[in-house]
Amino acid sequence: MSRNDLSSAPSSSAAPPARILLVTGLSGAGKSTALRTFEDMGWETVDNLPLSLLERLILTPPSSVAAYKGRPLALGIDSRTRGFTVDAFLKGVEQLRQHHSQPIDILFLDCSDSELMRRFDTTRRRHPLALDRPMEDGISEERAFLAPVREIADFLIDTTTTSSHSLQSELRQQFAPENSVAPNVSILSFGFSRGIPRNCDLLFDMRFLQNPYWEEALRPLTGLDPEIADYIEQDPSFLPAVTKIKDLLLFLLPRYIDTGKSYIVIAFACTGGRHRSVYVAEWIAARLRQAHFSLTITHRDLKLPLLESQSNRIRAGKAYQGG
């Protein structure tokens, strides 16, 4: 890859990647798992990019979406990459480091021959260098072929005794952005009367709290209004319950990191989805934000009209816990 070859590469004043990591290693050692983990951590990831396009990719402006600008970049490269030779790879890395100020590092994933054979046998896949010969021959050839890359790697991880979840945890500890302490959290409020969402990871039923729906002056309001907050907080069960829920979530969410979970939906429900579930969702969201969790909050049923079945029960004068 010569300097002249790159003369047509696009230039841009857009924010370059904050960091560039070249992810390589032995086939079956965990490159795909590593790239998925980097993507979950907010990195931009590209797999099996031809070496001749490395410089062009780095100079290409990122997506116009603000969240993509200046993100770290993880590039998956191995012996199957088009145009890959060790000499070309080493020369390309040297040139990138000369022409770019941001950190450019190499992560090499290693694994024992016996474990690689077990993994390929388990998945019933062929080793890419052993299509017409014994698997151990292909593994040995690739190991020798990539030895010079392994020698200069900035980070070396041996995955022989490492599970997929353990590898994800190790990568997060090593490479997660400084402000990344948790998976993305989505908090949802809804009403049981309109059905339970299918994507909830954790669901808390808040129908045990006193119901502002039965106060005629409060009925038109929602859990976003201070009058509703005051009413719900008067319930002696409120503070002990939400405090225990908060403590449980602060305990669980970091452990989702360790298992590689990058997205979790926490749902709070009442009957109509307008009062109790809304306020509790907001209360919990505020405490999680204080703990520096990245989250979004959605109130599914907040602006929906009262269901006909609810109206009938109210007109019949039954002790129905709506809202």
Swiss-Prot record:
InterPro entries: P-loop_NTPase, RapZ-like, RapZ-like_N, RapZ_C. Keywords: ATP-binding, GTP-binding, Nucleotide-binding. ATP binds at residues 25-32. The keyword ATP-binding applies. The keyword Nucleotide-binding applies. It comes from the Bacteria. Displays ATPase and GTPase activities. Belongs to the RapZ-like family. This is Nucleotide-binding protein ZMO1325. It comes from Zymomonas mobilis subsp. mobilis (strain ATCC 31821 / ZM4 / CP4).
